């Protein structure tokens, strides 16, 4: 989730500085996992080709790690050229929405601290109306959520008796003859 901020005109944005320089890892309130959330600021002093946020300034990205929502990926046919069915189901689990709401509010609280007084001109997104209640913030989150990492993943390896195993100990994909990973 991206929180967009307009910086003050006199705040120097260094076009040679890395866009990403630091990250905050923390455990969401009530989490049983350590570091299940991540927040990082990014500087946008120069345009990036295809970047959806053209204004100069900064943004804060809040990421839910160890999401409880689970998406779905399946083949529509055995034709390798046909697009597969993908449903990410972002924020489908209430706990993921709760954690992301908390992350957005942590960012907004950080921006109220004195070190940001000389940096932040105004909040661009979310707007005040989005912050009016959990319901309006959830609606905004669901409309604007996106994946924040490069797509990659792992599939469980295990015995035939393990329903969650996708491949056997030799990397053979279950249910697809002749396919190994």
Predicted regions, residues:
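Hydrophobic, small-residue-rich alpha-helical packing segments that form membrane-like cores
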Residues: 2-6
């Amino acid at each position: 989730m991206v929180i967009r901020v307009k910086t003050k005109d006199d705040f120097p944005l260094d076009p040679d500085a890395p866009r990403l320089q630091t990250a905050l890892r923390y455990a969401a309130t009530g989490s049983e996992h350590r570091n299940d959330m991540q927040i990082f600021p990014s500087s946008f002093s120069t345009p990036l080709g295809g970047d959806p946020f053209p204004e100069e300034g900064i943004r804060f990205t809040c990421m839910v790690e160890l999401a409880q929502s689970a998406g779905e990926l399946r083949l529509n046919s055995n034709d390798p050229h046909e697009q597969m069915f993908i449903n990410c189901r972002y924020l489908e689990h209430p706990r993921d929405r709760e954690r992301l709401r908390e992350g957005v509010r942590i960012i907004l609280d950080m921006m109220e601290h004195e070190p940001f007084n000389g940096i932040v001109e105004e909040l661009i997104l979310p707007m005040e109306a989005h912050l009016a209640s959990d319901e309006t913030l959830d609606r905004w989150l669901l409309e604007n959520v996106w994946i924040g990492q490069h797509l990659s993943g792992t599939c469980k390896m295990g015995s035939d008796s393990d329903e969650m195993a996708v491949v056997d100990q030799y990397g053979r994909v279950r249910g697809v003859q002749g396919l190994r990973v």
